[in-house]
């Protein structure tokens, strides 16, 4: 890594006035740059892990920019294991931008996305699973997602991966010893090797089982509410969100565009799309809304087909069902205060049916239960989720599994020991990719490019 000193704003920049903003420096010149910018009244000592009070100034003109605090963390006792300085100034957009510009004028370089965490990884402060956990924690959209990400930051995924990799290394050492010193050692216990590989493979499979949960926690679900006009789609959205998110009237075609809202159900972030009522219409604007409704439903992870119990199942409902029946679908029978669900006839192939009285906020908890059952995540509880692997980690685990299967095949086919070692090394390399012990620069670039600038 180049011996440069980097700088970035570490707090969110929003148009509203914030109370505090943080600008972070890391690198060999962090302290010297900070001393160009920070004036401390009195005789405050520049010591590691101490907070100093003073004024931040332009390095060239000595014009005062802001009044604030400075936090000094000297290597190796810092996030990056380099000298780190943080300016804690007033929030908002102007003050932090001026402090950052002053850092750059004094010799710092603007940090790339994730560069602070990349340096922490390269300097041995974090392994790769912990670094990815940092990104997931920053981007978490639910408490469960945050807790699963925190488990990654704490190394709860890296620990079993390292243990499995070490077991593969131990097995490889046993096999290679027989290749190099066959006459000096007892015969290899092939049954024992097979049993060990099977156990490692099973453990990898158990870790892989968290991949779908991890994907749900990170990316969530998109749920589209569809149906004919005036069946209560917007009322359902408002009841679900507990606010007047969508306009509700008795006039068909009130909703002309897709209305979005964000919710969390059982720890899963959900984007809810309230769509325009789907019907044949000569109104050009409404027709655009109908087209967008179709597009939203086709791209959704789950469709809530909503019907009016007082009207019953119509030919239009049947057409909508046929259009979206290949997608995960829940039937919402709304307005059951007018006609009980038992009197409504609908296709028997629909497995999930929920009764609601959206105008009275009834049936929402049953709807959320049905959603969790549909995506098979009833057990998705933060307390039971030690970690949640991402797609990159899952791909590496699958590579390791395939390599172990090849070794087992070589044993079964009585192939020479040299064949065993090739795939054992493949499994070891794949597991090393997860923790970063065996990783390419291009993969690192791809991982850290999704970080925010100041992390």
From Swiss-Prot:
GO terms for cellular component: cytosol. Its cofactor is K(+). K(+) binds at residues 230, 249, 251, 254. It is found in: Cytoplasm. Mg(2+) binds at residues 234, 255. CDD domains: trmE, TrmE_N. Exhibits a very high intrinsic GTPase hydrolysis rate. Involved in the addition of a carboxymethylaminomethyl (cmnm) group at the wobble position (U34) of certain tRNAs, forming tRNA-cmnm(5)s(2)U34. PANTHER family: TRNA MODIFICATION GTPASE GTPBP3, TRNA MODIFICATION GTPASE GTPBP3, MITOCHONDRIAL. Belongs to the TRAFAC class TrmE-Era-EngA-EngB-Septin-like GTPase superfamily. TrmE GTPase family. This is tRNA modification GTPase MnmE. It comes from Acaryochloris marina (strain MBIC 11017).
């Amino acid at each position: 890594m180049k011996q440069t000193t980097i700088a970035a704003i570490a707090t969110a920049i929003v148009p509203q006035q914030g109370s505090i903003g943080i600008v972070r420096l890391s690198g060999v010149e962090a302290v010297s740059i900070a001393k160009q910018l920070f004036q401390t009244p009195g005789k405050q000592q520049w010591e590691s892990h101490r907070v100093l009070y003073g004024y931040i100034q332009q390095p060239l003109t000595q014009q005062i920019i802001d009044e604030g605090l400075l936090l000094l963390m000297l290597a190796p006792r810092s996030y990056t294991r380099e000298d780190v300085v943080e300016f804690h100034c007033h929030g908002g957009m102007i003050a932090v931008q001026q402090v950052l510009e002053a850092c750059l004028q004094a010799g710092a370089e603007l940090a790339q996305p994730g560069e602070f965490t990349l340096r922490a990884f390269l300097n041995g402060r974090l392994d790769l699973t912990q670094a990815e956990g940092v990104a997931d924690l920053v981007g978490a959209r639910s408490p469960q997602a945050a807790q699963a990400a925190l488990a990654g930051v704490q190394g709860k995924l890296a620990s079993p991966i390292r243990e499995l990799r070490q077991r593969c290394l131990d097995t490889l050492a046993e096999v290679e010893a027989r290749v190099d010193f066959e006459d000096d050692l007892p015969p290899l216990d092939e049954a024992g090797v097979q049993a060990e590989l099977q156990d490692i493979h099973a453990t990898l499979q158990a870790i892989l089982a968290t991949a779908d949960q991890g994907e749900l926690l990170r990316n969530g679900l998109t749920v589209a509410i569809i149906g004919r006009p005036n069946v209560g789609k917007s009322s359902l959205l408002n009841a679900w969100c507990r606010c007047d998110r969508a306009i509700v009237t008795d006039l068909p075609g009130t909703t002309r565009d897709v209305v979005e809202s964000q919710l969390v159900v059982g720890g899963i972030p959900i984007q809810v799309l309230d769509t325009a009522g789907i019907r044949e219409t000569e109104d050009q604007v409404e027709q655009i809304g109908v087209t967008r409704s179709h597009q939203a439903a086709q791209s959704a992870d789950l469709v809530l087909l909503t019907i009016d119990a007082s009207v019953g199942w119509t030919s239009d409902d049947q057409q909508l069902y046929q259009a979206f029946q290949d997608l995960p679908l829940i039937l919402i029978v709304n307005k059951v205060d007018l006609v009980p669900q038992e009197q409504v006839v609908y296709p028997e192939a629909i497995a999930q049916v929920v009764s609601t009285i959206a105008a009275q906020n009834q049936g929402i908890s049953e709807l959320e239960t049905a959603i969790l059952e549909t995506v098979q995540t009833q057990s998705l509880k933060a307390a039971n989720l030690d970690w949640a692997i991402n797609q990159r980690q899952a791909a590496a685990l699958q590579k390791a599994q395939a390599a172990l299967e090849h070794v087992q095949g070589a044993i079964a086919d009585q192939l020479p020991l040299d064949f065993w070692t090739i795939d054992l090394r493949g499994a070891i390399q794949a597991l090393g990719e997860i923790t970063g012990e065996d990783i390419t620069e291009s993969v690192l670039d791809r991982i850290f490019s999704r970080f925010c600038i100041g992390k």
